[in-house]
């Protein structure tokens, strides 16, 4: 997802009436579309001194590399990279082979209430961490994402209270959640581009595949109970669009190298989130 934006070029030739009779051979490449280099052409006409013609810079010479989704904004670049890390069963753009148990189709999962509770508790720790970083930070990049409407920690608190009322014991956070939480804290201090990658993938993945997983798990073990974790105050599509615009705005200030660094963090985001998701099946 490459684009070529033509750039007007000009050919500067010393003024000479004899040049009106000069034409480029049809078998020769048009000098305006030669490969990136300065082309020097020597021409002798009617025994006159050789004339030097300098071909102008071509559009191809000036055209910078385009990244998949770049023309639509940086969020589309992040989406493109994320989708490629899915399996074919998870997304049509997926390129990853199914290896881990949580990567199998959800219909084949065998979730347990105990495992689901571990997943919810560890998820809450991650969302608590994200949202506390955003709310308490004076860093301008993070300030853009305060009170987006996508926040999940409070919703998860409500759900865990419901499970407690049903007689379930709420477990303590496990290693996957604690490890991810600590990693996010470290990134927030020293690597804002990488942190934003995790912010995007955590919230946007939950609003898409996360909802589907929640629905399927509820069908299997919760008698179709819809948890607050999968509900939003307001129109979800608009909340997501608002955050997309903020993300694109923030990324406009980044260099290409910083953008690439953000994209490269996607795989780690999937790794940490996958370890927490796997708890559902534990």
UniProtKB/Swiss-Prot annotation:
One Gene Ontology biological process: heme oxidation
Top-level taxon in the UniProt lineage: Eukaryota
Catalytic activity: heme b + 3 reduced [NADPH--hemoprotein reductase] + 3 O2 = biliverdin IXalpha + CO + Fe(2+) + 3 oxidized [NADPH--hemoprotein reductase] + 3 H2O + H(+)
Binding site for heme b: 86
pH-activity note: Optimum pH is 7.2.
Tissue expression as described in the entry: Widely expressed.
Regions annotated as coiled coil: none
Top-tier EC class: oxidoreductase
EC number(s) reported in the record: 1.14.14.18
UniProt-annotated location(s): Plastid, Chloroplast
Keywords of this entry: Chloroplast, Heme, Iron, Metal-binding, Oxidoreductase, Photosynthesis, Plastid, Transit peptide
GO terms for cellular component: chloroplast
Gene3D superfamilies per UniProt: Heme oxygenase-like
GO molecular function: heme binding; heme oxygenase (decyclizing) activity; metal ion binding
Keyword RNA-binding recorded: no
Transit peptide, residues from-to: 1-54
Principal place of residence: plastid
Pfam families referenced in this protein's UniProt entry, alphabetically: Heme_oxygenase (PF01126)
InterPro entries (UniProt xref): Haem_Oase, Haem_Oase-like, Haem_Oase-like_multi-hlx, Haem_Oase_decyc_pln
Null mutant phenotype: Long hypocotyl, incomplete chloroplast and leaf development, lack of photoreversible phytochromes and lack of phytochromobilin, the phytochrome chromophore. No cotyledon expansion in response to bright-red light. Increased levels of jasmonate (JA) and constitutive expression of JA-inducible defense genes. Increased sensitivity to salt stress and no acclimation response to salinity.
Protein induction: By salt treatment. Down-regulated by jasmonate.
Activity regulation field: Activated by ascorbate.
Its biological purpose: Key enzyme in the synthesis of the chromophore of the phytochrome family of plant photoreceptors. Catalyzes the opening of the heme ring to form the open-chain tetrapyrrole biliverdin IX with the release of iron and carbon monoxide (CO). Produces specifically the biliverdin IX-alpha isomer. Can form complex with heme, is ferredoxin-dependent and its activity is increased in the presence of ascorbate. Plays a role in salt acclimation signaling. May affect the plastid-to-nucleus signaling pathway by perturbing tetrapyrrole synthesis.
Family: Belongs to the heme oxygenase family.
Name used for this protein in its record: Heme oxygenase 1, chloroplastic
Protein's organism: Arabidopsis thaliana (Mouse-ear cress)
Gene that encodes the chain: HO1
């Amino acid at each position: 997802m490459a684009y070529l934006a033509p750039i007007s070029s000009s050919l500067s030739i010393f003024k000479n009436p004899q040049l009106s009779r000069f034409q480029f051979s049809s078998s020769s490449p048009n000098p305006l579309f030669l490969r990136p280099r300065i082309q020097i052409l020597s021409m002798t006409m009617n025994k006159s001194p050789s004339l030097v013609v300098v071909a102008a810079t071509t559009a191809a010479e000036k055209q910078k590399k385009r990244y998949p989704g770049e023309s639509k904004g940086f969020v589309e670049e992040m989406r493109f990279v994320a989708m490629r890390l899915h399996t074919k069963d998870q997304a049509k753009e997926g390129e990853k082979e199914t290896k881990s148990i949580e990567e199998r189709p959800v219909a084949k999962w065998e979730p347990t209430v105990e495992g689901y509770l571990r997943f919810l508790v560890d998820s809450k720790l991650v969302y608590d961490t994200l949202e506390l970083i955003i709310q308490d930070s004076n860093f301008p990049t993070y300030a853009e994402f305060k009170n987006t409407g996508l926040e999940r920690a409070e919703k998860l608190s409500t759900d865990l209270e419901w499970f407690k009322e049903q007689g379930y014991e709420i477990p303590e956070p496990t290693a996957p959640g604690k490890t991810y939480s600590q990693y996010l804290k470290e990134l927030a201090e020293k690597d804002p581009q990488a942190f934003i990658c995790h912010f995007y993938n955590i919230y946007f993945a939950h609003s898409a595949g996360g909802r589907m997983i929640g629905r399927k798990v509820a069908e299997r073990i919760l008698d179709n109970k819809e948890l607050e974790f999968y509900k939003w105050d307001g129109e979800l599509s608009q909340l997501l669009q608002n955050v997309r615009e903020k993300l694109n705005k923030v990324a406009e200030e980044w260099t290409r190298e910083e953008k690439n660094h953000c994209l490269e963090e996607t795989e780690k985001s999937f790794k940490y989130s996958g370890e927490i998701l796997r708890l559902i099946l534990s």
